[in-house]
From Swiss-Prot:
The gene is nuoB2. Its cofactor is [4Fe-4S] cluster. PANTHER family: NADH DEHYDROGENASE, NADH-QUINONE OXIDOREDUCTASE SUBUNIT B 2. The keyword Repressor does not apply. This is NADH-quinone oxidoreductase subunit B 2.
Length: 264
């Protein structure tokens, strides 16, 4: 929160309230963040613990987990996002009213986690929707999620009405729904463009919070080699020993050629 004038604090103690529309508006939103009752995998167990009496999230106004996206302000993406579930996540996000926020909880929701190179796991929910706060861990403890909620409140305190995206103002306004991905021949697609291909290829995403428009590359962690799995894609060539992830090229190539098992 921005620094407050000591004279203003003294007047408030005497019952005289001096404020701005921004401060009053942000105070109302930060004090009533209603999460959506929405869990994907094991991180959701920690999210349930976060909502119990031990951590007392009622003091932040976030104890009301809503069953409908129409009544929710916050989506906590808790756990692994499979490519089959990804379109439903985007649909739920589009049904939430602005202002709406997203917390990416855990390594899987943020980057795919230990399943990053799998054929069925989305490598980060920010490929499809903007994320406000990331929570590392596998799984994160409830205290980490509580810290993420406090971090989100700090972000809300710094917002200005003339710059928020839901009023169509600012550098990159968002006034339409986010496109729902569909299944293509090699992965998730949006308008025919491959978003998260199978086989460890580079990632391209138009949505990376908070700037809404940067590109994200899947080669950041492994700049020297693009990891691919030949046993999943017959068209992949064994150009690097690490691509087979410990399997000899002969065995991997034999797996590609393996056809139906004979009855002999």
């Amino acid at each position: 929160m921005a620094d407050i004038d000591p004279n203003q604090l003294e007047l408030e103690r005497q019952g005289i309230l001096l404020t701005t529309v921004n401060r009053f508006y942000n105070w109302g939103r930060r004090s009533s963040i209603w999460p959506m009752a929405f869990g994907l995998a094991c991180c959701a167990i920690e999210m349930m613990a976060f909502g119990l009496s031990r951590y007392d999230v009622a003091r932040f106004g976030a104890e009301l987990f809503r069953a409908s996206p129409r009544q929710a302000d916050l989506m906590i993406v808790a756990g692994t996002v499979t490519k089959k579930m990804a379109p439903q996540v985007v649909r739920l996000y589009n049904q939430m009213a602005e202002p709406r926020y997203v917390i990416s909880m855990g390594a899987c929701a943020t980057s795919g986690g230990p399943f990053r190179d799998g054929y069925n796991v989305l490598r980060g929910i920010d490929l499809l929707i903007p994320v406000d706060v990331y929570v590392p861990g596998c799984p994160p403890r409830p205290e980490a999620l509580l810290h993420a909620l406090m971090t989100l409140q700090e972000q809300i305190d710094r917002q200005k009405l003339g710059r928020v995206r839901w009023y169509g103002e600012g550098d990159k306004p968002q006034t339409t729904d986010f496109p729902v991905p569909t299944f293509g021949a090699k992965g998730l697609e949006i308008d025919g463009k491959l978003i998260d291909p199978v086989g460890g290829l580079p990632l391209l995403s138009p949505y990376t919070s908070p700037s809404h428009g940067e590109h994200r590359s899947g080669q950041i962690e492994h700049p020297e080699v693009v990891r691919q799995f030949p046993i999943m894609d017959p068209e992949v060539e064994l150009e690097h020993a690490l691509k087979a992830r410990g399997v000899s090229p002969e065995i991997a190539a034999d797996d590609l050629k393996r056809g139906e098992v004979s009855n002999a």
